[in-house]
Amino acid sequence: MSLSETATQAPQPANVLLEVNDLRVTFATPDGDVTAVNDLNFTLRAGETLGIVGESGSGKSQTAFALMGLLATNGRIGGSATFNGREILNLPERELNTLRAEQISMIFQDPMTSLNPYMRVGEQLMEVLMLHKGMSKAEAFEESVRMLDAVKMPEARKRMKMYPHEFSGGMRQRVMIAMALLCRPKLLIADEPTTALDVTVQAQIMTLLNELKREFNTAIIMITHDLGVVAGICDKVLVMYAGRTMEYGKARDVFYQPVHPYSIGLLNAVPRLDSEGAEMLTIPGNPPNLLRLPKGCPFQPRCPHAMEICNNAPPLEAFSPGRLRACFKPVEELL
């Protein structure tokens, strides 16, 4: 089945769908406040994909949880996030539930823990449509089958009667993608959607998301540590470290001409098929403890280009159209 058979009209690509300004996420802990996301800024248009990249603890997932209103109870949000012209941070719970169901959806990292093991997959899909679209049970069943077909689930009608444990990891992730798209959201947030999958299934899921993006004109935020995933699907890339933006720009620019030592380190750590026998490169050290961040640039203790001026926090500045970075090292010395 063609995805276009189930697609509905979406905003024109020229329109800014999501605008995030100075997003800040802080958690109160017994040891003090931890700032997980520090003054994050980006925009996303309909049909675009933004990749948010970084090591564990960089603030990627907390950015997504803040936008979805899913922070832990000790979390606090600052800044602004405007979706379709509407401020969505700190919305009342009822409005937030409606927004999450009908406008913004999320694919979580582990589909096995996101699906109810005691309910048939079909029942879980149908529940979304009956609750949020007011469909009858028969209508919800047929629409769920159509969406499973759309995500290329083999024998979709038969699979409706199966339980999550009867599916492979890749098939469970297809179920989660189908569920996320049932209400035709304008924004899809995918949090490490291929981490637990083998490389063949990863490629299939990435191809599927690309097709869905084109057919539904859905904007996607792809949260990942895998730069190969970013290269395959993203239009823009935001590189995060210790809750801050290190580099931001078009995906092809960041890949072929990275201009921040952290971005360069991440790319150098990706295994290459044309470097047989070459040493596997890594970034020395570990991400910082957010309770005890180093003075100045948070990447300074691990940076091969660290200078005395790095004891001051580098501002995030534009150095060419559409590109930002936070680093004192001259651009030409990193290219």
Swiss-Prot record:
Transmembrane segments: none annotated. Residues 18-267 form the ABC transporter domain. GO terms for biological process: peptide transport; protein transport. It holds the Pfam family oligo_HPY. Belongs to the ABC transporter superfamily. This is Oligopeptide transport ATP-binding protein OppD. InterPro entries: AAA+_ATPase (IPR003593), ABC_Ni/Peptide_Import (IPR050388), ABC_transporter-like_ATP-bd (IPR003439), ABC_transporter-like_CS (IPR017871), Oligopep_ABC_C (IPR013563), P-loop_NTPase (IPR027417). GO terms for molecular function: ATP binding; ATP hydrolysis activity. It catalyses: a [peptide](out) + ATP + H2O = a [peptide](in) + ADP + phosphate + H(+); L-alanyl-gamma-D-glutamyl-meso-2,6-diaminopimelate(out) + ATP + H2O = L-alanyl-gamma-D-glutamyl-meso-2,6-diaminopimelate(in) + ADP + phosphate + H(+). Part of the ABC transporter complex OppABCDF involved in the uptake of oligopeptides, including the cell wall murein tripeptide L-alanyl-gamma-D-glutamyl-meso-diaminopimelate. Responsible for energy coupling to the transport system. Plays an important nutritional role and is involved in the recycling of cell wall peptides. Binds ATP. Its EC number is 7.4.2.6. Signal peptide: none annotated. It comes from the Bacteria. It is an enzyme of class 7 (translocase). Induction: Part of the opp operon, which is constitutively expressed. The complex is composed of two ATP-binding proteins (OppD and OppF), two transmembrane proteins (OppB and OppC) and a solute-binding protein (OppA). It comes from Salmonella typhimurium (strain LT2 / SGSC1412 / ATCC 700720). One of its GO terms (cellular component) is plasma membrane.
